[in-house]
From Swiss-Prot:
GO biological process: L-tryptophan biosynthetic process
Keywords of the record: Amino-acid biosynthesis, Aromatic amino acid biosynthesis, Isomerase, Tryptophan biosynthesis
EC number: 5.3.1.24
Keyword Cell inner membrane found: no
UniProt xrefs under Pfam families: PRAI (PF00697)
Known catalytic reactions: N-(5-phospho-beta-D-ribosyl)anthranilate = 1-(2-carboxyphenylamino)-1-deoxy-D-ribulose 5-phosphate
Family the entry assigns: Belongs to the TrpF family.
Organism lineage: Bacteria, Bacillati, Bacillota, Bacilli, Bacillales
Top-level class of the enzyme under EC nomenclature: isomerase
InterPro entries named among the record's database cross-references: Aldolase_TIM (IPR013785), PRAI_dom (IPR001240), RibuloseP-bd_barrel (IPR011060), TrpF_fam (IPR044643)
UniProt GO MF annotations: phosphoribosylanthranilate isomerase activity
Name of the protein: N-(5'-phosphoribosyl)anthranilate isomerase
Gene3D superfamilies: Aldolase class I (3.20.20.70)
Pathway entry: Amino-acid biosynthesis; L-tryptophan biosynthesis; L-tryptophan from chorismate: step 3/5
Length: 204
């Protein structure tokens, strides 16, 4: 099971997450309490192992700006959390991830219409797109087609206490955590370590 730690804002957390076995790190360029500047993201990314995915998170940003930041920072993927459509997705010259809020089983059908490399299933959107720390009913995704499951990233309120049930129910390709590895709004490296250990253990 692959693990993505999202909302990275400092070098130390990024390096420790990689040491503990994170497969991907997320950098938020949209409005969020975890927003990072392209300059700082570039500094961090330059120090990371080549095999770790570096994913930029955007919300309704222009294709030109997404591409500019991706090239400048050395991103490997971009994650689209807004109302982006296939026309915009096709214009991107970088692998992409489309985020969808889950409210019913029909969201699986909607997801298959997007021409992206991965689909990230998250809790329904609130003030900020993602990172709200709230779960949704994983049972809604329990019967997805194999071809969709193989490109599914599961997010939304995950933590070390509920990750086993989430993985058992959805069986995604990757899990994505942000607020579930924080203490008082800041990334907690011990929680990151425990989340990664638990995820890898229960997906063997």
């Amino acid at each position: 099971m692959k693990v993505k730690i999202c909302g990275i804002t400092d070098m130390e957390t990024a390096k420790r997450a990689c040491e503990y076995g994170a497969d991907a790190l997320g950098f938020v360029f949209a409005e969020s309490k975890r927003k990072i500047t392209p300059g700082l993201a570039k500094e961090i990314i330059q120090e990371l192992p080549a095999n770790v995915l570096k994913i930029g998170v955007f919300v309704n940003e222009s294709v030109e700006m997404i591409q500019k930041i991706a090239d400048e920072c050395g991103l490997t993927h971009v994650q689209l959390h807004g109302d982006e459509d296939n026309y915009q997705i096709r214009r991107l010259n970088i692998p992409s991830i489309k985020s969808l809020g889950v409210t019913s089983e029909s969201d699986m059908k909607n997801a298959q219409e997007y021409e992206t490399d991965y689909i990230l299933f998250d809790s329904p959107k609130e003030k900020f797109h993602g990172g709200n720390g709230k779960t949704f009913s994983w049972e809604l995704l329990a019967h997805m087609p194999k071809e969709l499951r193989e490109k599914t990233i599961l997010a939304g309120g995950l933590n070390a206490l509920n990750i086993e049930e989430a993985i058992r129910t959805v069986r995604p390709y990757m899990v994505d955590v942000s607020s579930g590895v924080e203490t008082e709004g800041k990334k907690d490296v011990e929680k990151i370590k425990q989340f990664i250990i638990k995820t890898k253990e229960c997906s063997k």
